[in-house]
C-alpha cells in the first residue's frame, strides 16, 4: 500500500483563511500532479511546511496520535463511570470509607495440623 505524505504547499496556501474556491481547485490539481508523479505546473513554487525531516514528522505524528488516544480513553472512561450505575456502587470499601461499615474477612484459615510426636520429643529419633 502506498501512502502519500504532503510535505509542501504552494506559496501563499499556508493560511487556510486565505483559501477560496479557485485556490482549492489549484491545490487539488497540484495534489493530483504529485499523486500521479507528474511535475508541478510552471510558476508554482513549493515551500516546505516544516524544517523537520520526514522521520521527525512521523515520530511527532505518532506521539501526538498516542497522546490523543490516551486522553480520549481517559476522558471517555471518566464520563462512562460518572454516567453509569458503577459510580453508585456501595461495596465494602466504599462503606468503610464513608464510616458506615467495616471491612471483614469472611475467609477463615484452617488450623495447622498437629505434628505427630512433637510434644513427646520423639520426632526425628530412630528406634
UniProtKB/Swiss-Prot annotation:
Residue intervals annotated with topology Extracellular: 1-65
Gene knockout outcome: Embryonic lethal at 12.5 dpc. Mice exhibit impaired angiogenesis and dysregulated neuroepithelial development.
Compartment annotation: Cell membrane
Protein's membrane topology: Single-pass membrane protein
Superkingdom of source: Eukaryota
Record GO cellular component, one term: membrane
Segments passing through the bilayer: 66-84
Principal location listed in the UniProt entry: membrane
Tissue specificity statement from the Swiss-Prot or TrEMBL entry: Widely expressed with higher levels in kidney and aorta.
GO MF, any single term: vascular endothelial growth factor binding
Cytoplasmic topological domain residue ranges: 85-127
One GO process term, biological-process aspect: blood vessel development
Keywords tagged on the record: Cell membrane, Membrane, Receptor, Transmembrane, Transmembrane helix
Function: Dual receptor for both endothelin-1 and the signal sequence of vascular endothelial growth factor A. Does not act as a receptor for angiotensin-2. Does not bind the VEGFA mature protein. May play a role in angiogenesis with a significant role in cardiovascular and neural development.
Protein name (record): Dual endothelin-1/VEGF signal peptide receptor
Native source species: Mus musculus (Mouse)
Lineage per the UniProt record: Eukaryota, Metazoa, Chordata, Craniata, Vertebrata
Amino acid at each position: 500500500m502506498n501512502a502519500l505524505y504532503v510535505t509542501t504547499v504552494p506559496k501563499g496556501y499556508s493560511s487556510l483563511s486565505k483559501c477560496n474556491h479557485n485556490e482549492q481547485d489549484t491545490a487539488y490539481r497540484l495534489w493530483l500532479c504529485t499523486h500521479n508523479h507528474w511535475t508541478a505546473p510552471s510558476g508554482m513554487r513549493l515551500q516546505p511546511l516544516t524544517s523537520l525531516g520526514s522521520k521527525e514528522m512521523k515520530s511527532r505524528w505518532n506521539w501526538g496520535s498516542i497522546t490523543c488516544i490516551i486522553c480520549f480513553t481517559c476522558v471517555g472512561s471518566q464520563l462512562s463511570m460518572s454516567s453509569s450505575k458503577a459510580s453508585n456502587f456501595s461495596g465494602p470499601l466504599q462503606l468503610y470509607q464513608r464510616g458506615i461499615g467495616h471491612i471483614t474477612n469472611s475467609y477463615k484459615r484452617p488450623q495447622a495440623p498437629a505434628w505427630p510426636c512433637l510434644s513427646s520429643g520423639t520426632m526425628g529419633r530412630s528406634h
